[in-house]
Design a protein with these regions (language model features):
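Helical element adjacent to the flavin cofactor pocket in flavoenzyme catalytic cores
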Residues: 108-161, 165
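Flavin-binding catalytic cores
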Residues: 194-196, 213-215, 223-266, 273-277
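Dinucleotide-binding Rossmann-like beta1-alpha1 core, especially the glycine-rich loop
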Residues: 18-99
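Glycine-rich FAD pyrophosphate-binding loop
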Residues: 1-14
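A short, glycine/Asx- and small/polar-enriched loop/turn
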Residues: 103, 147-153, 157-158, 263-268, ...
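Short beta-strand to alpha-helix junction loop
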Residues: 28-40, 108-124, 230-234, 292
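C-terminal catalytic lobe of FAD-dependent flavoproteins
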Residues: 252-318
Length: 318
């Protein structure tokens, strides 16, 4: 049974660009354990496509625009070391990028990357659970939850385990007050760029990811000190200025979205059971890695819950 408030605070999963990418494009290095996480993610989303009868995954190439000569040289060196992931553009791709973008230091091609149709996934999965009688759309009230080491009772629902997947709100959960939660907010713009080809992801100091037809997700920023989740107008103006310098095409801002990310000190994932209350588990702290690392971590947690001898993914809980 899933309990989820339908109209709560903005969820980071809704604001996310939802991209699976094996390469850290800023450092030009491979993401740690990328083969393990990506294999599990692709298998999970393909299985969900079959279950839901919709398309959720789309393989793409990412064009990485170099900001300076140092970054260009770094990518040229890495291309020789990582030819399966970093390539030169074809003549047709060079012509395409020159038509739509201004660029001084060249471009590398990273791929494949996978775009997840996050909005469709979340909506379809919610409907699937609801039709199965497995979704309770209300605010969870922990005061009404009776939790014992061997069982959990919430209103009329009896269970052996409760898994808290609260995102940024997890830092206020008394069971996990000693975990190293930190605050981080991110925001993105939804842009209308009708003539920009939607078969690619474009990365500069900001990233453009195809969304709905003619629309692109543009983001994202990271802010560690904040008092609210209101759109940052200064960031928006700076981003629009960067877009005007980078894009040769006109664009229009359709929306400006903000959400608080569930992050931890050291960017450590939290997936495991409470050391003193084995019926209580947590799945949190994935930050910007939720769509890419979440499936593998969730599978590990499920194995641990059904067989406690199986290790959990988070060292912070044990």
């Amino acid at each position: 049974m899933v309990i989820d408030e339908p109209h709560g605070p903005p969820k980071a999963s809704v604001v996310a660009g939802a991209l699976i990418n094996p390469v850290n494009v800023n450092r030009c290095t491979m993401v740690a354990d990328h083969q393990h996480y990506i294999a599990a993610a692709l298998e999970t989303y393909r299985s969900m496509e079959e279950t839901l009868g919709i398309s959720l995954l789309e393989a793409m190439q990412m064009f990485v625009f170099h900001k300076d000569e140092t970054k260009r040289q770094l990518y040229n060196e890495k291309q020789l070391q990582l030819p399966a992931y970093i390539q030169q553009l074809t003549n047709a791709e060079i012509t395409l990028t020159q038509q739509f973008f201004r660029n001084k230091y060249g471009i590398a091609k990273v791929g494949p990357v996978w775009k997840i149709h996050a909005t469709q996934l979340l909506s379809a999965w919610s409907s699937f659970l609801k039709n199965k009688g497995l979704l309770l759309q209300e605010q969870f009230n922990i005061a009404e939850c009776g939790i014992r080491p061997e069982s959990v009772q919430y209103k009329t629902i009896s269970a052996g385990k409760i898994i808290f997947c609260e995102g940024a709100a997890g830092m206020h959960n008394s069971f996990f007050k000693n975990l190293p939660f930190t605050k981080n907010r991110g925001e993105a713009l939804l842009l209308s760029v009708p003539d920009l080809p939607a078969e690619y992801v474009y990365h500069y100091s900001i990233r453009l990811v195809p969304a709905a037809e003619g629309l692109f997700w543009c983001g994202s920023n990271y802010k560690w000190q904040f008092n609210n989740l209101l759109p940052d107008q200064n960031w928006r103006m700076q981003t629009e200025a960067t877009l005007r310098q980078w894009l040769r095409l006109p664009f229009k801002v359709v929306d400006h979205v903000v959400a608080e990310r569930p992050t931890t000190a050291g960017q450590q994932f939290l997936a495991g059971t409470h050391p003193a209350m084995p019926s209580v588990a947590i799945f949190n702290g994935l930050g910007t890695k939720g769509f890419s690392c979440g499936p593998a971590l969730a599978l590990d947690l499920c194995r641990h819950l059904t067989d406690p001898d199986q290790p959990a993914s988070s060292r912070a809980l044990h």
